[in-house]
Structure formats: C-alpha cells, structure tokens
Amino acid sequence: VMDVVYNHVMSADDFCINKLVPGYFSRINEDGSYSNGSGCGNDTASERNMVRKYIVDSVCYWADEYHMDGFRFDLVGLLDTDTINEIVEEVHKTHPDVIFYGEGWTMETGVTKDNVTLATQRNSASTPDFAFFNDNMRDGLKGSVFDTATFGFVSGATNAEKKMADSFMANESWCKEPSQIINYASCHDNNTLFDRIAGSKTTSSEEDIIKMNNLAAAFYMTAEGVPFLQAGEEMLRTKVNDDGTFNSNSYNAGDEVNSIKW
C-alpha cells in the first residue's frame, strides 16, 4: 500500500503547474493568500477539472506501472468526493482489488466552487468504496493523541464501555458500513501504542503495559471493520530519544529512533 499526498505541495509558489497557470492548482483565499487547511502552506484545488485529471492520472499510473495493492491518502478530507470516486472508478476498471483509505479529518479550506463535498468521515456515504481511519477507536483505546495524560479503555478510563462497544460494532456516528472503517490504535503519527500507554500509566509495571497493548490489539483486530496496525506494534515498538523521552513526532528523527528493533 502506497502513502500518497495530493492535498498540498511543498511550495505552492514554486510548483510547476502554478508556474504555468498561476493559482490554478491551489486554493486561494479572497485576500490572495493560499488556503492552508493542510497546515503545510497550501491546499490542492482538486475540484478543478484539470487538477482532478492530474490526480486521477497519477494514481492510475502508480496502479498500472507499479502494481500497488492499495493507496492511503494523506489528509483526504481536503479533497473532494468527485475526485475520490473517479480515482476509485478508474483504478478498479483494471485493478478491482486495489483498496483505498485515508485520513478523513474535517479541516477548513477555501474551495473554489459551489456545492463541493469534501471526502471527510462524515461524508463517507458519498464515497462508498473508500475507507477512513477511525479516531474514535484510536483515542478510545489508549487516550487522546492530543493529551497524553488521558487514559483509554485498555488503561483504565472510566465510563468508556459504551463508546468502545459502539466502535467494536461499527456503530459510528459518521459511518455505518464496516468496510469503510479502518480500526487502529497507532500509526506513524504520534506515539506508538506502547509509548502512549507507558506515558500515561507511569506507575504500571511493564508486564501490565504489555497486557494493555495486547488488549488493544485484540480489540481492533476483532472489531467490525478493517484492522490496521503500525509495523512493529505487535512486538511493542517504541520510539525513544537520546534523553529517554518518548518521541511522538519522529518524521525528522534518525534510524536510532525509527528503526524496528527486530
């Protein structure tokens, strides 16, 4: 499965298509600034016809020439549903088993046309063959990724049973189809599962933390939906800095932090 990032480019001013047709590829605010729902300086105007064609052709090329089994879309909530549906339709014409999923978070972005529906969790009914990460299960199992002092179901959170029962049965407010729900406890973003539990349960023994890790795995692997696990999570992967602290955003850390300790 290939991780693809179509929701923004590194530098909108320097991007080749914006050089050829200034402002066409990116969403522009009324004051002339770039829309920045991505937090990366710009948002792709996927709702424009030729931007959509560019993205669809790109994904089809990866599927045709490199035989990808699936695509994971970064911040797909910034792309429109028509583009996503066209991608799925075109790829499935020749590769019907390719899977599609992504981050369907809701973000503010300056779309350039009226009546544009974005590919967010809550619009999942508009993209029936596309799945979304389930942050309800992620945070419900181990605590919020935005507050590492909080507990989750496996670490002893109170009054968590109803929420987790709903997640287990795919009874999510944003989606009723299990095939569109990616259940997980951790991914490359934020802390690993082991580090997140250990960070909030500092008085627990390592043996108990391992049991919590195993309980989380049992939960998302048997729940209604599609299970997803970070590589190494099954062997208690940890990301530790030189000073002994846990690294929660290791994109710029070296192999010592990011490598899987086989």
Roles of regions detected by a PLM:
Residues 1, 68-72, 97-101, 183, ...:
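Structural preference for beta-strand elements that scaffold enzyme active sites
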Residues 1-66, 86-95, 99:
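Substrate-binding/active-site clefts of carbohydrate-active enzymes
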Residues 3, 62, 73, 100, ...:
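Conserved, mostly hydrophobic/aromatic
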Residues 6, 77, 104, 155-159, ...:
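Short, flexible loop/turn elements at secondary-structure junctions
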Residues 11, 37-52, 67-79, 197-209:
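The substrate-binding groove and active-site-proximal loops of carbohydrate-active enzymes
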Residues 11-17, 111-113, 194-197, 240-244:
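Short, solvent-exposed loop/turn and secondary-structure capping segments
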Residues 75-175, 233-262:
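Active-site-proximal helices and loops of the catalytic beta/alpha 8
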Residues 178-262:
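Loop/helix patches that line or flank the sugar-binding groove of alpha-linked glycan CAZymes
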